[in-house]
């Protein structure tokens, strides 16, 4: 059985490909059911011209027929802490566990999971910090290789600044 680091490493590779190929935010998601990959999603906000084409939503939408009937556990590996929208989608799809690399200090949704206990029948286990440094370095690389003309640049710059401040 592969561990969380294995799947997160795959997600980070996918995020780097999306960044290089499409100038997208370096955020991606891999959906795993009982240690078998059932989907991959990359953030596509630049390509889609919007702000809700998140990797988590993309992979859950693509695998929608499988998520309710697949073997368990169903684990969502994402390179950045999910926002509240993506957390809600994961809960509604019955994800058992969410694993993320880097915290999204300005808008991360993991803190809302505990607030939802008692409201929703099933809340996924949430594990953060898996290969956190690798994702942080990828975010820094995005800032260095892109500029303010990329709409995602400001968000990534804020993520990195707040992350660095949290380390002090």
Regions found by a protein language model. Give the residues of each.
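Short cysteine clusters
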Residues: 83-86
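Zinc-dependent deaminase
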Residues: 1-18, 89-168
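Short beta->alpha transition motifs characteristic of CBS
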Residues: 38-45
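A short, polar/charged loop-to-alpha-helix boundary motif
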Residues: 47-58
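Short beta-strand scaffold segments in enzyme catalytic cores
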Residues: 26-35
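Short loop/turn motifs at secondary-structure junctions and domain boundaries
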Residues: 19-23
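Immediate flanking context of iron-sulfur cluster ligation sites
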Residues: 69-80
